[in-house]
A protein has these predicted regions:
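Glycine-rich, pocket-lining loop/helix-strand segments that form or immediately flank
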Residues: 38, 49-52, 94-103
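Structural motif
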Residues: 34-36, 79, 123
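Beta-strand-rich cores of mature extracytoplasmic or soluble domains
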Residues: 74, 89-94, 98, 106-169
Length: 169
């Protein structure tokens, strides 16, 4: 199935971190709020797969590879990101529902990245506020723009005429 999605430039999201659906690759610069898929660096991908956060897929990270991670871009190069026990602030604005957790759903300690940073050129900070237990840049830091692809939900590109629009003629 993954080979078919690569040929068609599709990505299927079944994770609660983003709206469920079928997404396709779009030629767009990585903008704040854009949904992207990314291959995590090998060691981080292996960590995520070993813990069951990600399944098998096309990215490097152990036998059988690791699936791509889908998230929204929260901060771009030059943005100031502050992560504390209370949550994430981007350029001084508190992001609702962004408090990092100490443990995952199985009680295992999560990596902790606290402090203030400025996102460097060529990087983005990924964050999901759709799901409280999302594994994102709060735990592993920014990711390289060169490792991500911007995607868009297929249904966002489909216009469906209401069923009543063709009646009465």
């Amino acid at each position: 199935m993954d080979w078919l999605s690569r040929i068609l430039s599709l990505w299927i999201n079944l994770s609660p971190s983003l709206p469920l659906g079928v997404y396709h690759t779009v030629q767009s610069p990585p903008l704040r709020g854009a949904i992207v898929v990314v291959c995590l660096p090998r060691a981080l991908g292996q960590f995520a797969r070993d813990r069951g956060y990600l399944g098998r897929g096309p990215c490097a990270g152990g036998a059988g590879g690791v699936e791509r991670l889908g998230k929204r871009i929260a901060a771009l190069a030059g943005d100031t990101v502050e992560t504390s026990a209370e949550g994430v602030r981007i350029n001084g604005f508190a992001i609702p529902e962004s408090r990092p957790l100490l443990t995952d759903s199985r009680g295992r300690l999560l990596p902790q990245r606290r402090g203030r940073m400025i996102v460097r050129p060529g990087e983005v900070f990924l964050l999901s506020t759709d799901h409280r237990r999302s594994f994102d840049s709060r735990y592993f830091g920014p990711v390289a723009v060169s490792d991500l692809v911007v995607v868009r939900n297929v249904l966002d590109d489909v216009t469906v005429a209401p069923c009543w629009s063709h009646r009465g003629r």
